[in-house]
Each structure stands twice: as C-alpha cells, then as structure tokens.
Design a protein with these regions (language model features):
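Extracellular/periplasmic carbohydrate-active domains that bind, remodel
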Residues: 1-315
C-alpha cells in the first residue's frame, strides 16, 4: 500500500461543510476525508485533479438535495473514491456519480481511476428519491470494487411511480473492470454496458418486485417482455463476465421476462457461469442469455449456463 499523510486531507464534517467548502478544498488540491454523517449536497462536487483521494468513514452519505449530480469525477489519472453512500433526493437527478464528462480515447491504463465500496440508494429512507440513472462511467480504464446500486423495494417512500429510477449503472468507457457489482430493482435495464473490453467478476441482480402489469415492463419498443438485467450493447466486440446471477420475485403481477442477460452473439463476447433463480411470486424468467437457457417457472428454480459465446452454450 501507499502511505498518505493526514495533512493532505481536508477533514469534512456534516455539521460545518457544504458544497462550497468541499469544492474549495478540492480546488486547493486537497484529498477529502468524510467523517460519518449525512451531507446535503446542493451543488455538484467536482473532483478535477489527478490522484485525488475521496474517502468516506462510517458510510458517510452524500445526498442530492436539489436534483443535482452529487459528484463529477474528471477524466484524470489515479482518482480514488471509496466508502460513500450516494442518496437520491426528492427532485430527480440525471445521475448521482458521473465519471468523465463524455466518452474519449484517453487511456488511464498505467494509473486507473478506482471506486471501492460505493453505494447508491433511491428511496426507502427520508425521501422518495428520484434519479434517471445512478452511475454513469464515461472514462476508460476504470476499476470498480463492490458497488451496491439499489432502488428501494421496501420501507418508506417506495412505489413504482414513487421512487422512480430508470437504470442503475451505464458504462460507456472502454477497458472497465468491475469486481462485485450489485444492481437491483430499477425500472428498465439494471446495467447497460456500452464500452469495449469490459470485464465483470461477480454480478448479482434482483429485477423489480413492484411491476404493476406486463404492459409497463416491455423492452425493445414494447416488442419484448421485460428488461434484461444486463444489456451489453449490440456494437460491443469484446466483453467477458464471470459469475452472473439474476433473480426474480414478481410480487405484484404475473410478469414474464424474456431474457436475464442480453449480449451480441459474436466471438469475443464470453460469459462464464450465468444463472437465474425464481425467488418467489408469479411469472418467470424465460431464458438466461438471449434466447438460450431454460425458464425459471417454479419457486426455487435455478437455471444455469456454464459457458456462452456467439450463441453456443455449454450447460
């Protein structure tokens, strides 16, 4: 590991700090250490300098209080963010964490950006949170380790038209690697992966419990039942996953989900050990990957594909 003097950090406290004080510290070249508590973020926190460290203690919570992006991380080498909960506010945000303003050809292969133990919540607490998409990754060579991205399915301020959130995470950058990605209960695709050469190690996803009717949950311009949990873009040439689990509990209606995972059928797009499980409720997941794999028709059904590439499966 690397030693960093505490003198290089601005020590943040929810009792004294706001977006202005935090952004000033960042502009001055300080790392940020968030002490435990809830921070009302009224303006986007701008992490613009390479090798900046943003570190949260005790699950420090950053709340979007005015429909803003909570944190924008610039397309710079070596930025590290860890130990934070991003909370959607009452007014809809476009995203809570944005990494890079847009897709570029800039490589960070020698000094990747990294995000560890970061959590995202939409509803289930003080507010009926609203966001279009929790996490947007545009930069290349990003490493993610333990992301929990959650639209609330229980507790207070929860409902299909209450705590609204379309997607959990959208990955546009190339050479992005995720270790332990958990994405649950969003209203359309949980995860959209548009970048090339993505690698995913362990993915867990529950589809939304609270779909009111099949008509409200159809993809591909209403032609396909349900939304896959992971949608790898048709344009992607290389992608590889190890250990995907997608779970359904259609609590409120009899819902069919055509596929748990959608990927382009071509060599170079490889999936290892993919499974679906019916936890409870009505309906089913009809296929595991695209139109391959058996349906989860009965309570407790677990269906698996051991290897998949270019439409060829090994059970």
């Amino acid at each position: 590991g690397t030693f960093y003097s505490l003198n290089t950090f601005y020590i943040a406290s929810p009792d004294k700090d706001n977006s202005k004080t935090l952004n000033k510290a960042l502009a001055d070249g300080k790392n940020i250490l968030f002490t435990p508590g809830i921070y009302n973020i009224e303006e986007t926190l701008k992490v613009t300098k390479k090798d900046t460290i943003i570190y949260g203690m005790g699950l420090a919570t950053l709340e979007a209080s005015k429909g803003n992006v909570v944190m924008n991380v610039s397309d710079e080498d070596g930025i590290k963010v860890c130990g934070l909960l991003f909370d959607a506010g009452e007014k809809e945000s476009t995203t809570l964490l944005q990494v890079g303003d847009k897709k570029t050809k800039v490589s960070h292969g020698n000094n990747p950006l990294s995000f560890s133990d970061v959590y995202f919540r939409v509803g289930g607490g003080k507010y009926a949170g609203k966001v279009k998409n929790c996490v947007t990754i545009n930069s290349n060579n990003v490493i993610g380790d333990n992301f929990w991205v959650w639209r609330a399915d229980h507790s207070t301020n929860v409902g299909w038209d209450v705590n609204t959130a379309t997607n959990g995470i959208i990955i546009n950058g190339d050479n992005v690697t995720m270790y332990g990605l958990f994405v649950e209960h969003f209203k359309e695709y949980q995860t959209i992966w548009n970048g090339e050469n993505g690698k995913l190690f362990f993915y867990q996803s529950e589809l939304p419990y609270d779909v009111p009717k099949q008509k409200a949950y159809k993809s591909h311009n209403g032609k396909v039942n349900g939304y896959a949990s992971i949608k790898v873009a048709d344009s992607v040439k290389k992608f590889e996953s190890y250990g995907i689990g997608v779970y359904c509990y259609n609590r409120d209606s009899d819902i069919d989900i055509t596929s748990a995972v959608e990927v382009p059928d071509r060599k170079g797009v490889k999936l290892h050990n993919t499974c679906t499980v019916k936890l409870n409720g009505q309906g089913q997941i009809s296929h595991i990957i695209n139109k391959s794999g058996t349906a989860t028709e009965n309570l407790g059904d677990a269906c698996r594909i051991r290897e998949y590439e270019n439409g060829i499966i090994i059970q």
